[in-house]
């Protein structure tokens, strides 16, 4: 395993188990399970983050609903076929379980990657400046993770001018955001959840 590639993508999460681990898939005879972690924000709101964890880390663990746990890992993506369309699915891949730390930031992510689509700068109805961008982060075995990021204010203006291929270091938190999607032929929009990095620090790398 390339240590440098591990350093490209680092996540620390500490929160409460919202759903019991459910079997997800198997790779080379190793089972992987998925669960949701509920993590508080300073504002009082919460983020619900999907986590993928190996059966090897679950040995001797129960992970009851409401139990607080801490993990270190990586923010990863994969493509899933849904209604004959490829959908980008995001999850935190747990690499290790940690001791709880009341002093720690409960939700922090750091990635080194490349802008892989032209950034989209916009202003909200409340005059907040926002830029959405998609980052490609190299992973072992010639794979890449594609991570949506959202920047604010002066950071939004800065990255809004950058070109595809620019290498950036990004620090922030993983957030879950509900939105409504209008489906063809349906009267009521469908409530969906997006996962992205809310960027607090960005710099050229």
Residue ranges and their predicted role:
Residues 1-205:
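OB-fold and OB-like single-stranded nucleic-acid-recognition modules
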């Amino acid at each position: 395993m390339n240590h440098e590639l591990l350093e490209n993508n680092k996540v620390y999460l500490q929160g409460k188990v919202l759903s019991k681990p459910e079997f997800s898939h198997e790779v080379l005879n190793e089972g992987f399970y998925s669960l949701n972690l509920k993590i508080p924000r300073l504002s009082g709101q919460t983020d619900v983050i999907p986590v993928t964890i190996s059966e090897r880390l679950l040995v001797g663990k129960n992970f009851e609903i409401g139990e607080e746990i801490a993990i270190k890992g990586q923010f990863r993506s994969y493509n899933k076929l849904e209604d004959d369309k490829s959908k980008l699915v995001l999850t935190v891949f747990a690499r290790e379980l940690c001791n709880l730390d009341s002093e720690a930031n409960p939700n922090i992510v750091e990635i080194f990657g490349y802008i892989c689509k032209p950034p989209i700068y916009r202003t909200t109805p409340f005059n907040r400046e926002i830029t959405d961008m998609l980052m490609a982060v190299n992973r072992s075995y010639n794979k890449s993770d594609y991570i949506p990021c959202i920047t604010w204010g002066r950071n939004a203006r800065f990255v809004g001018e950058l070109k595809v291929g620019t290498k950036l270091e990004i620090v922030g938190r993983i957030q879950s955001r509900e939105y409504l999607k209008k489906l063809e032929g349906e009267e009521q929009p469908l409530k969906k959840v997006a996962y992205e990095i809310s960027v607090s620090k960005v710099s050229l790398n």
